[in-house]
């Protein structure tokens, strides 16, 4: 929390460190994953039957911190936690997502991209917690023909609008244009007007 100057909460606990890093404990599901060194991250591991005893205490402590953080964003979840009632993983993820979307909670994940350990879990977390295009508010622009201010919502049903943010030439493919699409669809071979 001090280093990041943010409300950082662990979503995972590492098993091992540095060259001896061999697994991850997911605090949302309380599942442990053993990334076998001889597989070099080529296969997705099966969850372990239980959390190893030497990591049980730290996992329980960090899980409590995660639940406290999640409960502050969802009153129903807070009530269930206080009353010691069961709650689902989906309810916990939804509460955590509220905090992340409000930019009031920063979940911390562990892994090694070099050894492909914990990478899939991180990518799953991107889907579970970070904003999707549907969470983004409508963008406002100007109609190039009328000068009228218009809004585009992130929907396939809206007319196409986008922003070219990079153009490059590839020796094998030719000219490549990178576009941030705000609404609609761009079909192959279609013409798009540059309004600027």
Language-model segments: residues:
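Structural and coupling elements of P-loop NTPases
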Residues: 1-196
């Amino acid at each position: 929390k001090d280093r990041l100057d943010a409300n950082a909460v662990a979503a995972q606990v590492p098993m091992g460190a540095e060259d001896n890093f061999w697994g991850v404990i997911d605090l949302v599901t309380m599942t442990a994953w053993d990334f076998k060194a001889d597989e070099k991250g080529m296969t997705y591991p099966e969850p372990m039957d239980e959390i190893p005893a030497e990591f049980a205490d730290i996992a329980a402590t960090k899980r409590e911190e995660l639940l406290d953080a999640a409960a502050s964003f969802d009153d129903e979840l807070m009530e269930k936690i206080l009353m010691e009632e069961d709650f689902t993983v989906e309810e916990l993820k939804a509460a955590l997502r509220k905090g992340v979307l409000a930019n009031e909670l920063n979940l911390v994940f562990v892994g090694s991209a070099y050894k492909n350990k914990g990478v899939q879990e991180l990518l799953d977390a991107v889907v579970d917690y970070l904003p999707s295009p549907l969470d983004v508010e409508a963008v406002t622009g100007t109609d190039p023909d009328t000068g009228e201010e218009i809004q585009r919502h992130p929907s396939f049903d809206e007319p196409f609008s986008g922003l070219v943010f990079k153009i490059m030439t590839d020796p094998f493919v030719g000219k490549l244009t990178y576009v941030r699409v705000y609404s609609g669809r761009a079909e192959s071979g279609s013409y798009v007007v540059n309004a600027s």
